[in-house]
Amino acid sequence: MYDATTPSDPPEPSGTPAYRTAGSYTLPEVCGRFVAASASRGRTAATAGAGVLTDMMQFTLRHTDTRTEARAGELATDHGVIRTPIFMPVGTAAAVKGIFHRDVRDEAGAEIILANTYHLYLRPGTKILEEAGGVHRFSTWEGPMLTDSGGFQVFSLADCRKLREEGCHFRSHIDGSKHLFTPESVIDTERAIGADIMMAFDECPPGDAPREYAAKSLALTERWLDRCFERYAQTQPRYGHYQALFPIVQGCGYPDLRARAAENVRQYDADGYAIGGLAVGEPTEVMYRMIEVVNAILPADRPRYLMGVGTPTNILEAIERGVDMFDCVMPTRNGRNGQLFTWEGTTFDRRYSKAYLHHLVTCGEMMAAQIASLHNIAFYLRLVRAAREHILAGDFKEWKEAAVAKLGRRL
């Protein structure tokens, strides 16, 4: 058994392995079943409930900056088109904390939100989500949605989880009940939730993990990834819209492990690719270097998603390095704690003075968290929209350098 409190010994297959060990497979072995299933899916459009499914998610690059790797594109889903670069507000339990969906969409301008498989699995559970017709109908969010697989949440539960080859045993943070996540069960759960973009199940090791731990953890993630895509190919969407599956690149702060992981995931010919395991304790310069290593290998014609990052400066630096999609709890979490992100002190909603906002925060009024959270999400979305405009205009580099200089100031 792999105990999270003893990170030197991740599990490895023993005897005759049920799943391939990392490095022992060839491209046809890893991808043959998935590629064949993908081709079949493309030839015969599956139907489920309301309509006919598209056979894949379409990503169109509109412009790539000539002096950086920054890109402007469009990602077409069955629930709408997402203009990239994009920030995805985090709605862990299918709700962005403290804000109405209409305000997230209409006031802040969100085009896609993120929910979490781990939390939705525990509450309300897949049975209720299935009876409701999926997370879109359940939550009344009509736009695109992405679900994280729960790998990071499992990483966060270090004191109450254990990893094995089959998957992850953990105790609920709610009531202490015992559960098991496997690559197969996570895909089944994400199918039941019904988000437009699903994430593969992975292990997210600490950013400063020793190399031996990082290598064994990556090998486990790669074996799990093969099982995720096999299950994905065996199942169909349930609610009449296409669901993409993004693999996740791990490897901590080791360039060779990151490169190996990127080479491995690109073999799946997925609709998009995610970079995980960053902003989890490693120095910022290491994070930027890992993004560069990975993006040099990932296909240029697919969206790249940097998971859980980050500050406004982090986002602009990552856009410069070729990242298209972001999520982070920082806008809402910091908003609930009275911190606002601004351009030189200007607030998003000018109906409220800064004096009044300060008053609400010091009084502990619920309205303070709501206004501040909406303001911060609007700030993040305006930031990535501005980045997109300057990429298209051809002056992204100059604008980004000036913006980063301003973003580092505290008012």
PLM regions: where:
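Conserved, mostly hydrophobic/aromatic
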Residues: 80, 113, 148, 190, ...
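Non-catalytic, usually N-terminal nucleic-acid engagement modules in DNA/RNA processing proteins
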Residues: 54-238, 361-362
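Glycine-rich phosphate/ribose-binding loops and adjacent secondary-structure elements
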Residues: 219-222, 231, 235, 242-351
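Intrinsic, low-complexity polybasic segments
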Residues: 8, 17, 37-38
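Radical SAM enzyme core and accessory elements
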Residues: 383-411
